[in-house]
Amino acid sequence: MQLEDYFEFLTPEDIRIKGTRVGIEHVLYEYIHCGQTPEAIAQKFRTLTMAQVYPTILYYLENPKTVGQYVGG
């Protein structure tokens, strides 16, 4: 997984899903804190595809400490 294929690292505090204005924290909030499925997240954020939602969740699952700090816990 090449992170640059999926995300735009604008600043250390601003990581967005490539090709969108959606920050990864919005998707991960729905996944981590609300228990939403990837399908429900894609429906909520209509500009995102499943091919964008899944890598965002995978990035979190593979890097829980780093991404957890980014999203605030």
Residue ranges and their predicted role:
Residues 1-17:
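Short, Lys/Arg-enriched N-terminal segment that forms or immediately precedes the first helix
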Residues 23-73:
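Long, charge-rich, low-complexity alpha-helical segments
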